């Protein structure tokens, strides 16, 4: 089946007027926002300085890492050569990182037509502070990136008082898009036509119950792959469109480049996989059974083990030169105060026990274990066959 790249080939010569902008077009620009435009698009909420997409593509840094992949580079090249995308304007780029308040935030605005804009919030990057901020959402109603998203969206909408807006994000970016729209004043929200959330975690119940969210909810288009893990976190009351992914496993399916497409729509399924549903049940039960203070201490301690060892990003962990840091991380764990170590071990065990209970309740084995069992069964069968052949030969 097709992916987003096949769709882009299909619409190469179609303008936005020939074929209306849809969920796949929004996804393409949402993924594009992961690229580093720091020295390409002027930074600020209301710069009003535009850069054409095809021009920006020529200046993009071609270095790949955990976040920016070869597929992202292929994406920017394909968009730059496609009629409906190449003349889109990029503006109001913001990329902020503040370890003191534990904030990772990035956003950019796309001018699609004269008065139609798409505001995209970037998902979590490779910084541990960014990942830590994500887990803060399990015990904080509002995190710094969410508040920043709300101010960014309001500033952009005020800059273009006659504009109509789409708002979108993948992963944490979808969470920020929903949050920012929830806290828009009514006179601004009236100009938001749709909110696109791609495999994004939900919000805390305190936010879900606000009038702002109840007003916003009907405008949310929530897409998750069948094995979704990230998109099942926290409270996600609106029904999701379940997209078929060609990838194996929930975390790999988080990569939207693996999502299947037919014509100009996602290939959809009726329900998420048992693994996804079990993980959803596990995380929600673990949150119910632990206090906000316990979760705060757990994640502060867990991420502290890495940060104290000088590991500040996922790319640091992937760097072979930093393998010596692993020993330091384990040493940091051994050096924890006995109370901290007991808390870390207890909550980790509780999370694991909750997952095991979910397996028992569903009377299913996680797919990864089934695959491993099948592999070893086949391996043993091949070895047995080889032994018989050798014996027959003798």
Task: Please identify what each model-predicted range represents.
Residues 177-186:
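Short glycine-enriched nucleophile-adjacent loop
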Residues 1-24, 28-117, 121-164, 185-394:
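Alpha/beta hydrolase fold serine-hydrolase catalytic domain that processes acyl esters and thioesters
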Residues 168-173, 177:
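Gly/Ala-rich beta-loop-alpha elbow adjacent to hydrolase catalytic centers
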């Amino acid at each position: 089946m097709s992916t987003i790249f096949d769709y882009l080939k299909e619409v190469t010569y179609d303008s936005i007027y020939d074929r209306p902008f849809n969920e796949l077009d929004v996804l393409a620009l949402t993924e594009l926002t992961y690229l580093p435009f720091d020295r390409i698009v002027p930074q600020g909420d209301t710069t009003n300085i535009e850069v054409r997409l095809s021009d920006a593509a020529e200046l993009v840094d071609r270095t790949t890492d955990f976040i920016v992949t070869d597929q992202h580079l292929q994406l920017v090249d394909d968009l730059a050569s496609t009629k409906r995308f190449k003349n889109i304007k990029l503006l109001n780029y913001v990329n902020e990182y503040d370890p003191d308040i534990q904030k990772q935030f990035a956003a950019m605005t796309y001018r699609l037509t004269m008065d139609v804009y798409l505001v995209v919030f970037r998902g979590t990057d490779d910084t541990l502070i960014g990942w830590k901020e994500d887990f803060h959402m399990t015990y904080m109603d509002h995190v710094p990136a969410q508040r920043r998203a709300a101010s960014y969206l309001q500033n952009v909408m005020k800059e273009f008082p006659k504009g109509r807006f789409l708002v979108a994000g993948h992963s944490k970016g979808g969470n920020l898009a929903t949050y920012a729209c929830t806290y828009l004043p009514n006179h601004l929200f009236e100009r938001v036509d749709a909110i696109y959330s791609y495999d994004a975690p939900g919000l805390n119940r305190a936010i879900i119950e606000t009038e702002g969210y109840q007003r916003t909810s009907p405008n949310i288009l929530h897409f998750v792959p069948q094995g979704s893990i990230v998109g099942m976190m926290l409270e996600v009351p609106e029904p999701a469109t379940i997209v078929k992914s060609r990838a194996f496993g929930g975390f790999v399916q988080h990569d939207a480049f693996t999502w299947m497409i037919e014509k100009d729509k996602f290939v959809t399924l009726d329900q998420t996989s048992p693994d996804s549903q079990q993980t959803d049940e596990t995380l929600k039960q673990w949150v119910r059974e632990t206090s906000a203070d316990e979760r705060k201490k757990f994640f502060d301690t867990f991420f502290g083990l890495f940060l104290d060892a000088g590991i500040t990003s996922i790319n640091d962990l992937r760097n072979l030169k930093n393998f010596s840091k692993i020993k330091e991380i384990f040493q940091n764990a051994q050096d924890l105060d006995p109370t901290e170590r007991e808390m870390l071990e207890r909550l980790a065990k509780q999370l694991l026990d909750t997952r095991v209970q979910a397996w028992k309740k569903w009377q299913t084995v996680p797919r990864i274990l089934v695959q491993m069992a099948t592999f070893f069964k086949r391996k043993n069968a091949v070895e047995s066959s080889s032994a018989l052949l050798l014996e027959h030969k003798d």
